[in-house]
Every structure is written in structure tokens, then in C-alpha cells.
Amino acid sequence: MDGDRHHGDRGPVHARDRDLIRSRIGTGHASLNLVPRVAQSRMRAPVARGSLLRPGTGSKGSHCEQGLGRGREGMAQSVRSPIGSTFTTMERASMESVFGRRLRGLIAVPLLATLLGAAQAETVIRYGISLADIPLTTGQPDRGAGAYQFTGHTIYDPLIAWEANVDTRPGKLIPGLATDWKVDPKDQKVWRFTLRKGVKFHDGSDFKADAVVWNLAKVLDDKSPQFDAKQAAQVKPRIPSIASYKVIDDYTVEITTKDVDALFPYQLPWFLISSPAQWEKVGRDWAKFASTPSGTGPFKLDKLVPRERADLVRNAAYWDKTRLARVDRLVLVPIPDALTRANALLNGQVDLIETPPPDVVPQLQSSGFRIVQNVTPHVWPYHFSTYPGSPWTDIRVRKAANLAIDRDAIVKLLNGLASPAKGQLDKTSPWFGKPTFDIKYDLPQARALMAQAGYSKANPIKAKVIIAQGGTGQMLSLPMNEFMQQSLAEIGIDVEFEVVELETLYLHWRSGAKADMNAGKGITAINLAYVTADPFYALTRFEYSKYVAPNGVNWGGYANPQVDAAIDKIKTTFVAKDQDALLAYIHQQMVDDALMIWVVHDTNPHALSPKVKHFVQAQHWFQDLTTIGL
């Protein structure tokens, strides 16, 4: 074959792998390094009739041509599976990096000379991240919640922050650019924020109340001159409660919510504040601002090369002296392929990576690399559409789908880097409640429910699910989805996939199941990993009928009057223990209604080279990159 070259007994080196590595990291001599692939034998059942991961199909072009070179544009391609699967080369290679033939060797990543060329006086750490591109740097990152740790909470600060520099317990809300926030006892829709004094943006301008209101208009007021549709698309669904805002004085801001909402503070860690002065300086151009951004965060952006790297340098003048960065320079290197990331780490081209391939973890550990993971508020689900015409409107089908999944087998597939899900939340959560529907692997019960609904393996119901090629938080998207496809086929659910780039998946998610881009293509479920750290992010945004897309991210149109009543009540409940009781009831109803297929909770693993001595793995999807040090 033209794409294979053999090097002694170390197995084939594929041209597509070599092209990807060179396009991502650089050029140079490539050595070989033993990195095993996940074997198909770890699947619970053999692939039948062809599958999502079927080798030997795909369109022409290298990884670089098909994926990396397209920047922020999506790569939506309809994928029919089983029978007649078609994929881009990038998709196929990503799949084969986990399944297909076991390779005994993989090309090593060439030395990235430009990354090693930093001044020796600097302390530098290079971080291989799982995204295909650097997230937006203008203030509101794209590419999902995980991107906030890279170009969000590094360059910028929120009014209210998440405590992400502790690993022994869940973090909590803490003061950010606001030192205090209170609800008006006379009108509980009004919140007053006292701002931190003495804070400066990276450009030297002062942070004051005008900047807060200016930034709110930037994402909420499409008539304002600074409005940025790209940033608004990222954050507007995350701050749905805001109705209006105004300056009281230089260090006081008032925000009014649409309704009384005791949970409103949980929305504000997502709202980050850019410098109005810098925007003016670059000619009121957000594209230019992206190259020379200015926030108040612990890092400054020194260099940005789209799809290649972002250099963050320590902000020595950062206002929070307890959170100064441990290194002078942190280089973010997008490496979306998991095996390529692992080889970059093994060969010294990066110093730490996120989401190492599960089968490579033993080799990394035996080579002296440290694997760090922790309890993580995160779930990997299928989120159903419950609109008329969807195959998931029948609760028997939704419950059967949950009972068809062998979650222990998926955890084994992931080499233990996950835990089985019993719902949206981990059972240890105070908000788990007491659901009557016990989510487990029970194939006979699943088949019985499908029979009651009128379906079987011989007479299947068809469903189309939109999924990501990969990306931060999506775990091993393609092999896990093949496992799901096979498992659901066993009970009479014939799944077809639409495979897209992660940012495109987010567009489909924000638009809602009823949107033409979903309903028009027959898409009735979405596989998108969710952060579940707080009441809003874990529960209410998915269940409240007032948050049906595009007003929020109740993607599937779920509406339960009892749940709505509980959410209305919690929004007027300011006592924590009473909130906990209501949240437990809400989660209990969510599980009993089988709103999603809940599969596993991620443990958010990172692999660190021996030179990295410091890294606090928070019990959160946000990680504080200031804790990384030599």
C-alpha cells in the first residue's frame, strides 16, 4: 500500500500519521516509539454489518487537508452506519487510532524547535491540548466548556469565580472581580455587585464598573457598537437570567434578572471581561483584538498561531498574589489525536497532555510519567429530543436504551479512566435524590420494554445521533459511540451518526432539536459531554421549559410541569439546604423520565512528564493553569 512504510519489526508507519504530526508540530526526523492501540477485542461484541469504525473507507486528503486546515469552520458530513459508511481521512484515522489493526509502533513527534527556542532564563511548560484549534481569545472562548481553562480564565477574570486550585474537595464560588454580591431584599430580581479596586487590564487601563456594563452589552445587546456575535453565541445561553444592567458608581454594578433567581450567581463564572480601551486601540476590531487581547487575568497572550500554538506569559502584576502563575511561559499546543499527543509527551515535545489514550497509560507510567485524575463533575450522555416524531418520545424506548448499555465494559475500554453513570450526577452528590428508575445493564428488561413499544432486533426503530470527532470533554468519542451503536442494535435501535467537528456540534446544540439543522436532517439525539458542577449547569438548564433552545440549552424540548414548579420554587429559595432538597427532587424526576442515556462520568486524566512537579487537579472541569509548575 502507498500509505504504509515498514521499519524493521516495529510495524507500519502510516503516511497520514506522519502528515498529521508534521502539520501540527513541525518537520524533522521521526523516530519510532512503542504505543499500543486499543484492541477491538475489548469491545463487548464484534462489529456486525460494518460500523462507524469500519476501516478502508473515506474521502481523499490528509488529516491536515480534511480537518486542521479548515480552522473554525465545521466539517459536518452525513455518516451512514452500519452499511455504506463514509468518512473523511481525518475521521477514519482518528477511529483507527483506537480501533482497527493494532500497531506495534507509531511515528514519534519531531522535535518542535520553535517551542524549545524560548530564552533559557524563562521557565516554560508546553501543554498538549485535545482541541483542533486554539479557542477564541477575545474574552468568551469557543470550543466548549473545557476551553475556558485555556483562553478564558487564563487571560480574563469573571465577576464571580470557581475555586479551581484545590483537589481534596469540590470547589465553590469565590470572589473574582466582584468582592461581594447581594440580592436586594425589596426586589429579589436586583443584584448589586461591589467591584474590586486597584485592578488593571493588561493594557494598563483601569477596571471599573463601566467595563462590566460594556462587556455585558458586548454579548447581550446587538445594537451596541462593541457587540460581537461570536462571543455572544458562546455565553448568551450560559447567562439566560440577565434582563438589564447599569452602573451605580465606579465600583458598583447592578444586574436585574428576568425573574427572581437564587441560582443566578452560578451563571457568572462564564462571563469574562475584556478591555474596552484595548478594543478602541485596535480600531474597534474584534479580529485584531484576538491577536493582542487584554484582560485582567494571570496570563497575557504573547503569541497566537491559529491551529498551532498560543503562548501565554505570566502576568507579574496580577491582582491576586495567591494565584500568580508558577511558570513564565505556558505554550498551548493543539493536538487533537490522542496517540499523537501521547507520543509528543513520550518524546519530549510537550510536558503534559490532557486525555491520554487509555491503553497508553501503563506505558506512560512505566516510562516515569505521572497520571493525575480526580472526581469530576462531568457526564457523557445521549441527550434526546422529545418533540413529536422523535423515536425517543416513548419513555419505554428511552429507558430500554439506558438498560442496553454495559457501562462497566466502557469503563474497561477506557482503562478505568471513568466511572459508570447512574444519572446526570454522581451518586455521592447531595442533589442525586432517590430515583425509582435504576440505571444498570439489563438486556432482558431492555428487550422487554422495546417489545412493549412494538420494536425488536428484527423490527428496529431508527434514530440519528449527531456526535463529535473528538475534543476536550468528549473522551474517546468515536470508539465509545461505536460501542453505543452496537449495544443499541442489540435491542432494536438502529443508530445512524452524523459526525462533525466539536465546534459545529455546539452550534447544533445551541440551536435546539427543533432547528432545521437538526430536525431537517432527522437528528433526534446529540452526544455532547456536560459539565455538572453546579445546579444551573447540571440540572435546571436542561429541564426548565423556559430554557428551550434558543432561549437556553433545553435541547430536546423537555417539559414537565412538576419540574418547572420545583425550578420556580428553587429560584426563590435562598437557603442552601432547602435548595439541596429541591435539586434532589429535580434530578430524581430527570432520571425517572430518562431524559438522556447517561453513560459514564469522566475523571479528566492528565499525563505529566517528570519535569512537571506541580499541578493541582481540581474536582471540576475547569483547571487552574496557574498551578502548573516545574
Role assignments for model-derived ranges:
Residues 163-168, 269-325, 329, 339, ...:
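Gly/Pro-rich hinge or "lid" segments in bacterial periplasmic/extracellular proteins
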Residues 606-630:
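Long beta-strand-rich cores associated with HINT superfamily self-processing modules
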Residues 127, 306, 451-530, 541, ...:
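Ligand/substrate-recognition segments at binding pockets and active sites
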Residues 89, 194, 232-279, 303:
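Surface-exposed binding/hinge segments that line
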Residues 129-186, 294:
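N-terminal lobe/hinge region of extracytoplasmic solute-binding protein
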Residues 311-316, 365, 393-491, 557-561, ...:
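Append "and occasionally in soluble cytosolic enzymes with long acidic Gly/Pro-rich linkers
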Residues 287-290, 317-363, 494:
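Ligand-site clamp/hinge motif
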Residues 399, 411, 494-507, 537-610:
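Extracytoplasmic/peripheral linker and loop segments enriched in polar/acidic and small residues
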